[in-house]
């Protein structure tokens, strides 16, 4: 059997396109949750007994560090993080107020340190729970779309074959045009990755810091909505299901003229490549090399989209020519005269047929190559690039000014309000997190005793803090 019986480049690239979008979204969710909770992703999930971020079972360490902070010299008094080092230094005698402070507030100081450790432990547990929800949502969505898609393709192949052959090029043309539009939008998705990361970060952080949310499963709040408690499961589940079903529809449409045996290998290889890219994106999401890779991948995707757009128009024109020939597809007979509409032809060569000539099928599947170009296919190819360039230019202007000049504001009102809401939510999130940090870590140098209004810690110049 031929190689085309086991592998289809069309199915491979279609499924790769959709699966890449899925893994990128899931990777963004994981990255933002990890950064939002400020936890390390290595130790807590390797099964080691000493997980990073968990509190030490020795509770005396907190008391020792607190005492060491009060015993530290003036040069170390403003650095809380160096209290453990200061404990090893030569101690100085405590004055009366400091002794009163340690005696009267030792339990409170230990409770503050214990609460800080418990907060860190809760973050680790919360991250573990959210990570499981995100991965499980993506996995269940992928499984469900494969089950639905498998049944859809099987029924479509066995029942709709005869109906397909009557208007084959219409179906292929329309689906190619739709696929081109989807790829073009996904290219903007890659180019605007930084903005999308901020958008996802605001949305997900608003869920994390929601007062009504209960992602750790506290039984005292029984009124938590299902959509709030499992929001990190629902988002990747719906995304994976939607994108997966889109891939199945395109595979069932564009690849309908190919054998069923070519689907499994194409889908498995596309999934493997997407998984590798997702892991790479998750680990190196902020590196310069990844940004370069995204730009290169976007350029490659736009080449594919331009080819699909041109091929879609070419398919529609070919079907019109087939209808004029009483339903006989002359392009399947051969490459010579009579196999194409000479009234619409721009060029035609009697070889390099992308429909059946081996390696040229790769260029057809990727770049939309055809050995018989028409006026519509050539104009549509150039028009695609002109529209894309104008769209990117307008988006750059919008990024710079916040709106598009010389365009009625009423047409842009929805986008402007959306951008303002995201910016406001981002500022509120930063303000909220700063309040949390300030409330959980009040400087000890500002604490005052009952008997005096003078701060306990005096700087080296002798002035009170």
From Swiss-Prot:
It comes from the Eukaryota. One of its GO terms (molecular function) is iron ion transmembrane transporter activity. Residues 44-66, 433-465 are annotated as: Disordered. Residues 46-66 have a biased composition (Polar residues). Residues 33-135, 192-289, 380-465 are cytoplasmic. The modification Phosphoserine is found at residues 449, 453. Keywords: Ion transport, Iron, Iron transport, Membrane, Phosphoprotein, Transmembrane, Transmembrane helix, Transport, Vacuole. The keyword Cell cycle does not apply. InterPro entries: FTR1/Fip1/EfeU. Interacts with FET5. Belongs to the oxidase-dependent Fe transporter (OFeT) (TC 9.A.10.1) family. PANTHER family: IRON TRANSPORTER FTH1. This is Iron transporter FTH1. The gene is FTH1.
